[in-house]
């Protein structure tokens, strides 16, 4: 299969440019400049929160071929598990997408259908501390806020949960895969 990907960041396009089978386009979800009815599937992976849902849905409907499918994917820590929920609260990681709240794109799509997949990512406490530094709340925070979050994470992982440095921790994740067909397609 071939992939056409739309990315507004020149740096991100450059970083991903070596991925085989992908043609990168400068643009945004609301105005892709891609041709009408040219794609069987349009997917937003970890990006739906960045777009205007109405306009991005209308644009997806425009570029989808008849019978085309819109997909919206979220990978997130499984916050239904209490210790994971607390971990995400400390990291302020935004793992808040719920199965009972389907996305609402514009563009005349049939109701969203959900497939949910559980999986685990094995990480050490040190890798979780690094993961915390990738969250937008950390990046936007003051130095004092960053230090506080890292200190809270160290306390939670090492003292409260009792993990040792370098020890493997199986982090439960859930992937929410929403899909909808164009109405009347």
Indicate where each model-derived feature is located:
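A short acidic, Gly/Pro-enriched loop at the edge of an enzyme's catalytic core
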Residues: 30-42
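Class I SAM-dependent methyltransferase SAM/SAH-binding core
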Residues: 1-32
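Short conserved AdoMet
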Residues: 17, 52, 65
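Conserved Class I S-adenosyl-L-methionine
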Residues: 104-185
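Tryptophan-centric aromatic hotspots in well-structured domains and transmembrane helices
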Residues: 1, 32, 48-50, 74, ...
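Conserved catalytic/acceptor-binding region of the Class I
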Residues: 55-123
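A short SAM/SAH-binding and catalytic strip from SAM-dependent methyltransferases
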Residues: 40-54
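Conserved SAM-binding loop
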Residues: 5, 40, 72
């Amino acid at each position: 299969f071939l992939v056409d990907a739309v990315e507004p960041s020149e740096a991100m396009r450059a970083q991903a440019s070596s991925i085989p089978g992908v043609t990168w386009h400068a643009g945004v979800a609301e105005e892709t400049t891609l041709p009408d009815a040219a794609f069987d599937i349009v997917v937003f992976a970890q990006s739906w929160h960045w777009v205007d849902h109405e306009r991005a849905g209308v644009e997806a409907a425009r570029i989808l071929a008849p019978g085309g499918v819109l997909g919206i994917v979220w990978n997130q820590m499984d916050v239904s598990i209490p210790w994971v929920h607390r971990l995400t609260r400390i990291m302020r990681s935004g793992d808040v997408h719920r199965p009972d709240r389907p996305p609402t794109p514009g563009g005349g799509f049939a109701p969203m259908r959900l497939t949910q997949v559980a999986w685990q990512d094995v990480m050490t406490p040190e890798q979780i501390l690094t993961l915390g530094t990738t969250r937008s709340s950390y990046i936007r925070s003051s130095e004092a806020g960053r230090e506080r979050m890292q200190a809270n994470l160290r306390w939670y992982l090492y003292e409260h949960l009792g993990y040792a440095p370098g020890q493997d921790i199986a982090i439960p994740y859930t992937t929410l895969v929403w899909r909808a067909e164009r109405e009347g397609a």
